[in-house]
Structures are given as C-alpha cells and as structure tokens.
Design a protein with these regions (language model features):
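Acidic, metal-coordinating helix/loop segments flanking the phosphotransfer/catalytic sites
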Residues: 37-55
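Receiver (REC) domain active-site loop signature in two-component systems and cognate sites
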Residues: 62
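Two-component/phosphorelay signaling modules centered on CheY-like receiver
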Residues: 17-36
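C-terminal output helix
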Residues: 113-123, 134
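CheY-like receiver
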Residues: 2, 129-153
Length: 153
C-alpha cells in the first residue's frame, strides 16, 4: 500500500536554466510533487542516486552527458531500471523520438508543452510504475509463501 503522505519526487534535467526553473515551479504549484533539478546529464545522474526520484524528466540535447546517455545509464542500473523516464525535447523528428524510446524513455514530449499536460503525463507514468511495483511485490510474496509451504511436512 502506498503511503498517502508520500510526495512523489520528480527530477528535472535540462541545461536551459530558465526553462528548468519554469518547469520546476509549475510542477510544485500544480501537483503534490517534490522537485529536484539538474542542469546537465552528469549532474542528473548524481542527483538521481542522491534522491531516488519517482520520475525523471530529461532534455535530450545537453553538453557532456546528453539525455540519451543519461537514460541508458539509468536503465543499465538495477536500482533505477524501473523509474519512469520522460523526455521533454524540441527534437520533433520521428528518428529522434525512436532514439528516445530505444534509449529507455517511457514518454516523449515535445517542447513547448503546457504545464497541465506535463503534470498529466508525469502522474500517469508514476501511476503505472506504482502498479508495476505492487505486482512485483505480490509475485514475490506469492513465491515466498509457496517456499514456506513447501518446507512444511
């Protein structure tokens, strides 16, 4: 069961400081989210492992570690593999979107986007993630109870 007092944490990674603050402020005002920001991919990776967010919103084009590389790093780590990743990018070509999904994105959104639309997508991917987490826990409990039952006798 999810703790009703838990405020989901969203990590927003974008090298455009003005846009980063606008997104963070919109998420704080429109939804019950705790928001953490990072201004490049390397800092995003570092912040991810500091706060273990419930969702990560990622720009693609950033200096150094870009959004695709950040997603691949997160998907390659067992602790972050199931965290929802949402790309927020101005790159609108189908090949860009395909590259995003192949890198591990759960959603690919185009800039500019309205704040309410962004909140809706984040809420949806966090909800999906919670459902999947509960399913995994139930399956594990089922396996454990079968093991306990098999040892008796």
């Amino acid at each position: 069961m999810t703790d009703p007092s838990h405020r989901p944490t969203v990590l927003v990674v974008d090298d455009n400081e003005d846009l980063l603050e606008l997104i963070a402020e919109s998420l704080r005002k429109l939804a019950p989210y705790s928001v953490v920001t990072a201004s490049d991919g390397a800092q995003g990776l570092e912040r991810y492992f500091e706060v273990h967010p419930d969702c990560v919103v990622i720009d693609v084009k950033m200096p150094g570690l870009d959004g695709y590389q950040l997603m691949k790093a997160l998907r390659g780590d067992a602790n972050s593999r199931s965290t929802p990743l949402v790309i927020l990018s101005a790159m609108a070509q189908p090949k860009d979107q395909l590259a995003g999904f192949l890198s591990g994105a759960d959603e690919y959104l185009l800039k500019p986007i309205g704040p309410l639309e962004l909140v809706k997508v984040i809420a949806t991917v966090i909800g999906r993630s919670e459902v999947e987490r509960c399913r995994r826990q139930q399956a594990l409990l089922g396996e454990l109870s079968q093991q306990d039952g098999g040892d008796e006798g």
